[in-house]
Amino acid sequence: MPDITLILLGAGNSTRFESDVKKQWLYSGEIPLWLHVAESFEAMGAFAKIVIVSSPEDIGLMKHFADYTYVQGGETRQASLKNALEDVTTEYVLVSDIARCCVPAAMIHRILDAREEASCIVPVLPVTDTLYLAQTPLDREQVRIIQTPQLSVTKTLKQALQTDQLFTDDSSAVASMGKKVHFVEGSHEAHKLTTISDLKKLPCIEAPSGKTLTGFGLDIHPFEEGKAMVLCGVKIAVDYGFKAHSDGDVAIHALIDALLGAAGMGDIGELYPDTDQSYAGANSTRLLSDTVRKIRTHGYTIGNVDMTILAQAPRLLPYKEKMKHSIASLLEIRPHLVNIKATTAEKLGFVGRKEGVTVHAVANLTYYNWKQK
C-alpha cells in the first residue's frame, strides 16, 4: 500500500492571470489543466489518495471529470492545505500547485527517493542572476529558488501549521519547528503558471481541441393570468404570463439548459433550484448572464445557438428580431450567431389549446483557444 498522499492546490481565483478563464480550466487537448496535472502525477507515482483542493463552484464540476477526493479551499494557500490535511493518514504527503503543471518525472523521483533524508524534501534551483537586498549585494551561492512539489512527513507538517504564522510554502513551516529540510535538484521545466505569458514556457501543455460541444435544452411553462410575459428577455404585450418560480422566461430557461448541457455542467434545476427562495421571481436574464460567466470561466467559448418556440399564442413574429438581439447581447456574441424560430402546434396538445409554451434550444461551445491569444 502506498504511504504517500498527493495534494494538489488550486483554490485560487487566478487574479494575476488576467483572463476571463481560470487557469485551472484552460484546456490541454480535451481535458482541463487541473486534470492534466493530476493525471500526470498519477502516472509518475503510486499514491494512496489524490486530493484536489478547489472552490465549491469548481468542485461540483470537477466531480464530473474524475473520481478523486475533493476538498474546499480556504482564504489562503495555508488554510487550503490545512483543510486538505485533515483526513490524510499516510506517513508522507506530497504537496504541489495545479499551476505547477509541467513537473518532469525525474524531478518527482528525486523527491520521493530522498524521503528518509529529512522531514521535508524540497526541489530547488540555483540563482544565476546578481541579487541585491535593498542596496546590499547578496552572495547568490547562498540563495535558492524553491519549487513544488514538496514531500513532508505528514505528522510534522500538520503540527507545523498549527500556528497563526503564515508560511509561503511547506518547507518554511517545517523549518520553523527546527526540523531538517533537505534540498534536491529541481527543474526549469517545472515553471509555475502565474500570468498568461507563462503559457509560452510550458511545452507540456497542448493546444485545446477544436471539437464542437453541443447541448440541447427543453422547457415548458403553462400560462398564468395577471403576470407579465417575458420571452428571451423581451416583454410581450399580452395580459398573461407564465406560471413559474422565477419570471418564467421559458426561452431563456431552455437556452440555459442547452449551454449547461454542452459544458457538462448539469441543468438549470441544479444551479438555480426552485426550492431556493432567492430565485423567487428572479429575472431570468440574470440567471443567463451568470450561466455565461460560468461557461466562460470554465474554459468554453460560446459558438451559436438555435431556438424553436412552440406557441399557438401569443403571436411572436413581431418580436423575433428584438428577441434575437436580446439573446446575442446576453451571450456577448454577434446577432447572426443567434437563430430564433417560432411556430404553432397546429392546435394540437396543450400548446395548441393555448395553455402554455414549449421551447427547444441547441447551443454549441468550443474550448477557449488560449493558443491564439
Swiss-Prot record:
The record, for PANTHER family, names: 2-C-METHYL-D-ERYTHRITOL 2,4-CYCLODIPHOSPHATE SYNTHASE, CHLOROPLASTIC (PTHR43181:SF1)
Please spell out the taxonomic lineage of the organism that makes this protein. Answer: Bacteria, Pseudomonadati, Campylobacterota, Epsilonproteobacteria, Campylobacterales
Q: Spell out the reaction equation it catalyses.
A: 2-C-methyl-D-erythritol 4-phosphate + CTP + H(+) = 4-CDP-2-C-methyl-D-erythritol + diphosphate; 4-CDP-2-C-methyl-D-erythritol 2-phosphate = 2-C-methyl-D-erythritol 2,4-cyclic diphosphate + CMP
Domain of life according to the entry: Bacteria
Q: What does this protein do?
A: Bifunctional enzyme that catalyzes the formation of 4-diphosphocytidyl-2-C-methyl-D-erythritol from CTP and 2-C-methyl-D-erythritol 4-phosphate (MEP) (IspD), and catalyzes the conversion of 4-diphosphocytidyl-2-C-methyl-D-erythritol 2-phosphate (CDP-ME2P) to 2-C-methyl-D-erythritol 2,4-cyclodiphosphate (ME-CPP) with a corresponding release of cytidine 5-monophosphate (CMP) (IspF).
Query: Which family does the record claim for this protein?
Result: In the N-terminal section; belongs to the IspD/TarI cytidylyltransferase family. IspD subfamily. In the C-terminal section; belongs to the IspF family.
Q: What is this protein called?
A: Bifunctional enzyme IspD/IspF
Pathway where it operates? Isoprenoid biosynthesis; isopentenyl diphosphate biosynthesis via DXP pathway; isopentenyl diphosphate from 1-deoxy-D-xylulose 5-phosphate: step 2/6; Isoprenoid biosynthesis; isopentenyl diphosphate biosynthesis via DXP pathway; isopentenyl diphosphate from 1-deoxy-D-xylulose 5-phosphate: step 4/6
Q: Where is this region: 2-C-methyl-D-erythritol 4-phosphate cytidylyltransferase?
A: 1-212
Q: Where does a divalent metal cation bind?
A: D219, H221, H253
Tell me which InterPro entries the record gives: IspD, IspD/F, IspD/TarI, MECDP_synthase, MECDP_synthase_CS, MECDP_synthase_sf, Nucleotide-diphossugar_trans
